Amino acid sequence: MKGGTIQISWHDGKPVLTVDFHPISGLLATAGADYDIKLWLINSGQAEKKVPSVSYQSSLTYHGCAVNTIRFSPSGELLASGADGGELFIWKLHPSETNQSWKVHKSLSFHRKDVLDLQWSPDDAYLISGSVDNSCIIWDVNKGSVHQILDAHCHYVQGVAWDPLAKYVASLSSDRTCRIYANKPQTKSKGVEKMNYVCQHVIMKADQQRGDETKTIKTHLFHDETLPSFFRRLSWSPDGSFLLIPAGSFKVSPTSEAVNATYVFSRKDLSRPALQLPGASKPVVVVRFCPVAFKLRGSSSEEGFFKLPYRLVFAIATLNSVYIYDTECVAPIAVLAGLHYAAITDITWSPNASYLALSSQDGYCTLVEFEDKELGEAVSISVGKKPVDGEEKKHDLEKGDELMTETTPDESKKQAELEQNEESKQPLPSKITTDGKEKEHIMQKTDDEVMTETRHEEENQPLQSKVNTPVSNKPARKRITPMAIDP
C-alpha cells in the first residue's frame, strides 16, 4: 500500500467537501466550496513504486453555491450533486466518439436549505437526500419530482443511506437519532404498488446499569449538534448485511467519560447495535464499505465477529484519521493518521478496490493505492438474495438491549494521548508506505524521501502548492479492538 496527500490545486485552495468514484470508468469526482465538480483520472504509481497521481479531465459547472455531496448512480449513467441553498441537480452522461461529457439532466427543487448528503436507490430510479431543513426527501428521478418526504428529525439531517436490497433507508441527524425506514408499499386503485417508507426504528439511547443497583438509566448513543462537522455519512455493506453508523458516543458507565465509536447494525436486528468499534480520539464522521468482497484468508489467529462466506472491507474516517477494517479480523488492518491539517469530509473506494480517496477541508485530497490482491482475492456477491444466516455476530444478541464494552476510560485516554502526540509531530505527511511483513500498515517517511519527492513534484506539477512538510520518523501506529455488546 502506498499513498499520500496530492498537493495540487484541487478546488482553488478551497475546502474539498465530497468525493466519489465512477462505478464503471473509475474516474474520481470531487466537489467543494468553489461551486464546481471536477473529474480526475487516477494514474497508478505501482510500476515506479511511487504515490499515485491524478490528471485533470473536466469540470461540471452549474452550481451557484458550495457543493456538499456528489454520488454516481449504480449504473454510472447519472450523477447527483447537492449544494447549499437546497440546490440538487441530476447530471447525465453523454458519451461521444471523442470524449464523454456530463450535462444537467434535471433540477430537483424542494429543500429550503443546504443539502448535506444523498444516496441512490439500487435501480437508479430514486434518490434520497438529507438537508439542513431537518428533512429527508425521496425523489422520483425519472419524473423529477418529490416521491415522499420524511420529516421526523428535529435537527439537521447529515447522513442518508439506501439499502442495496431496497427494503430500508436510513438517516442520521444531529438531533442524536438514527431513523430506519422500511418499505411498506401502498396498493393503488389499479393494483400497482407504490413505494412507501415507514419509520420502523428510532435509535437514540441505550440502557446502562447504575453501579450495583438494579435500576438502569438511558444514555445517548450519538454526539449532539456540537460535533464540529456538517457530515455524518453512514453506509450499508454491498450485500445489505450490515449498516455502519458514525458519530457514536458511548459511555462504559453513567459516570465515565464518553468514548467515540462507530456502531455496526445487523440486518437481522436494526433496532440496536450488534457491535461497536471504539477508541478513536476524534469523532467519526464518515464510514464507507468497499464495493468488492474478498475471499476468506482463513489464516488469522484472531477470531472474527462475523460468520460470512467472504470478507468485507470498510473504512472509518474520524476528523483526523482513517481506520480500515475487514469482517474477518478484530483489529484494524490499516491506520492512517496525520494526513491533513483540517477535518476529513468524505471517503470513497474505487470500483475495483485499488484506491481509497479522502477529501478534507484543508483543500487537499489523499489517495491510497493497494497492490494487486493486497486486500485479498475478489469474489462475487449475489446482491438481491437473502443475507446469509451466519451474518450475525457469533455471540447471542437476542436477549437484551443493554450496550456494554470492555474498553476502560483509562485505556481510551491513553489511546487518545498517543494519537494526539503522534499527530502533533507529523502535521502533514505526504506519503504512506507499508512493510509487507507487518500486519498493521505504518505511515513513515524519511527526510531524504521528502526532499526527493518535493523536487520531483515541483518539476512535474506546476499547479502544486509548495509546502514544506514536517516529518516524524516515529511510525503512527494504533490498535483498536472492536467490542461486542454484552447482552
Curated annotation (Swiss-Prot):
Localization in the cell: Nucleus
Record-linked Gene3D superfamilies: YVTN repeat-like/Quinoprotein amine dehydrogenase (2.130.10.10)
Q: Where are the WD repeats?
A: 11-52, 62-101, 110-149, 152-191, 222-275, 295-335, 339-380
Record-level GO BP terms: DNA recombination; DNA replication-dependent chromatin assembly; double-strand break repair via homologous recombination; heterochromatin formation; leaf development; meristem structural organization; nucleosome assembly; pollen development
Q: Which PROSITE patterns match?
A: WD_REPEATS_1, WD_REPEATS_2, WD_REPEATS_REGION
| Pfam families the record matches | Beta-prop_CAF1B_HIR1
Q: What protein is this chain from? A: Chromatin assembly factor 1 subunit FAS2
Q: What is the lineage of its organism?
A: Eukaryota, Viridiplantae, Streptophyta, Embryophyta, Tracheophyta
Identify the coding gene. Answer: FAS2
